[in-house]
Amino acid sequence: MTQLPSAHPSPMTSRVEDSRTLVLERLFRASPERVFAAFSQAEHLRRWWGPRGWEMPVCTLDFRPGGRWHYGMKCTDPAQGQFFGMESWGLGVYREIEDGARIVYTDYFSDAQGGIDEALPATLVELTFTAQEGGTRVVNRSTYASEEGLKTVLDMGMLQGITETWDRLVEGLGAAPA
């Protein structure tokens, strides 16, 4: 068996299913309760959501079916060139929640007021959290209305961004008490 590097104890895997669903998987070395809390509480999301060099100064969360998660990220890293100072806004609308096990929401690009940007594709996101030896396996299924919608976000660098985001979550879980 190959030893994984300690900085990334379990790399994220990705695959496309049915030409419009991106499936991401990763093992996080923490309990399902801790990993689920990281996805469901604003104080945790603020610390890790977004790619490296981005902060989340705005994060309002009403974590219940029908509730909304509105967030704003800002690039604070001058080394990111044209992205430095840029803001990116999102709006999640929760559809289903199974405490500790599953979150389903529709993710939209938005503006600072929470208005949906209809020019960019919406995503139906299903997150599952499963206990297994060594931690919690998270599976993220992101489904788009069309193959073109998935291609749009992939061309925007979404896969690199979520890889960095989940790396930040690994680091945050490692720094938090067990």
Protein language model features and the residues they cover:
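Hydrophobic pocket/interface hotspot
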Residues: 35, 45, 69-71, 94, ...
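A conserved amphipathic terminal alpha-helix motif
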Residues: 1-7, 145-178
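A short, structured loop/turn motif at beta-sheet edges
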Residues: 32-33, 61-66, 95-102, 128-137
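Beta-strand/loop substructures that line and gate deep hydrophobic ligand-binding cavities in soluble
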Residues: 104-108, 114-160
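Contiguous, well-ordered beta-strand patches that form the walls/edges
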Residues: 79-84, 91-110, 114
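Short beta-edge strand/loop motif at the mouth of beta-sheet-based domains
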Residues: 23, 43-89
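Hydrophobic ligand-binding cavity/cleft-lining segments
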Residues: 1-56
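Hydrophobic/aromatic beta-strand elements that line small-molecule binding cavities or substrate pockets
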Residues: 26, 58-61, 90-96, 122-130
